[in-house]
């Protein structure tokens, strides 16, 4: 297997990114797809594209995908209340477990929404239960690498007219993240016109319509229980995962 990583930017700002794990015979085909994806991105034609291809020598981990649950909402305000409640329900367990004041959860979630609404991070922010940023580079964030889905899962998702390639990408990331020990994930797309976001927990991948407004930036935040940041970075970046 080979890892393909595409990153595209314009004037130093992130435009597009994607990860694939493929067999040797599919390298050329998938490389072409990734470049076309970068060049056709709605956020603008990039002036820089990096495509990195590496042989994967580690054992591939096969993970069952999180259950996909779609939450319908017609307004950003309602969607954010729904997202907040999903996050609070999950985070509260860990606050109580660690003897922390559950009244502080709202502040943590407020901070997370502030981060994603500012946008322009290449990767995800990481917040512990006290609201500390744990990324080694707060501008870059952390990127989840060495991931893909099986063809069968991809075809199943794309067979649903309400889902898209973005769902395929997101379910791969969300499934790996939760299996690496992240409590929950909050995400909105960096595609300006794609307003569906999601919350991921061990209970599922919750697609929430209208989690951001049309034309707005997006971002990603991981909530974690402890500060074993080096171990988390290693898993998220280096552990090869195929989601089925």
Swiss-Prot record:
Q: What class of enzyme is it?
A: ligase
Q: Which GO terms describe its molecular function?
A: 6-carboxyhexanoate-CoA ligase activity; ATP binding; magnesium ion binding
- The organism is Methanococcus maripaludis (strain C7 / ATCC BAA-1331)
What the entry lists under Pfam families is as follows:
BioW
Q: Which reaction does it catalyse?
A: heptanedioate + ATP + CoA = 6-carboxyhexanoyl-CoA + AMP + diphosphate
Q: Which family does it belong to?
A: Belongs to the BioW family.
Q: Which GO terms describe its biological process?
A: biotin biosynthetic process
**What Enzyme Commission number(s) does the record list for this chain?**
6.2.1.14
What InterPro entries does the annotation carry? BioW
The organism's place on the tree of life at top rank: Archaea
Q: Which cofactor does it need?
A: Mg(2+)
Subunit structure and binding partners: Homodimer.
Q: What is this protein called?
A: 6-carboxyhexanoate--CoA ligase
Q: Pathway, per UniProt?
A: Metabolic intermediate metabolism; pimeloyl-CoA biosynthesis; pimeloyl-CoA from pimelate: step 1/1
Keywords, A to Z? ATP-binding, Biotin biosynthesis, Ligase, Magnesium, Nucleotide-binding
Could you tell me what this protein does? Catalyzes the transformation of pimelate into pimeloyl-CoA with concomitant hydrolysis of ATP to AMP.
